[in-house]
Each structure stands twice: as C-alpha cells, then as structure tokens.
Amino acid sequence: MRLFIIDTVATVIFFTAVATFSELLIAGMAPSEVLATRLLMVPVMVLTGRPYTRWRDWLVRRTAPRNRWSAFLTDILAFLSFQAPVYGATLLIAGASFAEAGTAIGSAIILMILLARPFGLFVEWTRSLFGVELS
C-alpha cells in the first residue's frame, strides 16, 4: 500500500506539473480549462500510476540496464508500451475516432519519449525520499 501511495503521488505531481505547463503555455488553454482538465485526469493517474510503475519495475529488473543509455531506452520502452495504449483508450472513450486517436498518439509519442526517463528518475527520487527500495 505504501508503494501504491508513493508512486501514485509521484505520478500526479509529475504529470500535473508537465501537463499544466503544456496546456497553459503551449496549447494556450485558459487557467479554468487547465484546472478542469487536471482535475479530470487525477482519477486516471490514480488508476494507472502504480500499474505503470509496477510494469516499469518489472522491465527494469528483466533488462537490468547497465548504463545511462540502456536505462534511458528501458524507460522509453516501458513508457511507450504502457502509456500509449492507455492514452489511446482514453481518447476513444472520450469520443475520438480511430484516425483521430492514431494521429494524437503519433504526435504524443514524441513527448512520451522525452518524458519517459525524467519520469522514471522522478519516481526513483520520490521513492528514495520515503526510504523505499525495490529488490
């Protein structure tokens, strides 16, 4: 339960900060729209935060990255293989067509690649703050 809480809080903090920046400064959304979007995304992050970090932990143990480059690639593989399907399902549930979802996922992959390692490092840092180490 402790790891669930730590990983979920790390997920909510990291992606709320990144998405808020993106929505305000890149997408040009109004602060009220950003707030509404972020509040709607909290349940999604709560549902997917620990399952993602569990998947990432398994992949890290399985691949045993030996240097920064392999750790970077492992985080990208973990992030893309988990988050792209979640994002696609979210888009389809929200009413996007398959073509729209495909386009959105295609463009989001660039951001996913850029965010994968920083998020992995943030989760590891957050765990270390609370004295959690994985075997």
From Swiss-Prot:
Leader sequence segment: none
Membrane topology qualifier: Multi-pass membrane protein
UniProt keyword annotations, A-Z: Amino-acid transport, Cell inner membrane, Cell membrane, Membrane, Transmembrane, Transmembrane helix, Transport
Record keyword Cytoplasm present: no
InterPro entries for the chain: Ala_export_AlaE
Compartments (UniProt record): Cell inner membrane
UniProt keyword Cell inner membrane, yes or no: yes
A single GO molecular function term of this UniProt record: L-amino acid efflux transmembrane transporter activity
Entry GO terms, CC: plasma membrane
TM region positions: 9-29, 75-95, 96-116
Highest taxon of the lineage: Bacteria
Family named by the database record: Belongs to the AlaE exporter family.
Function summary: Exports L-alanine.
Protein name: L-alanine exporter AlaE
Native species: Cereibacter sphaeroides (strain ATCC 17023 / DSM 158 / JCM 6121 / CCUG 31486 / LMG 2827 / NBRC 12203 / NCIMB 8253 / ATH 2.4.1.)
Protein's gene: alaE
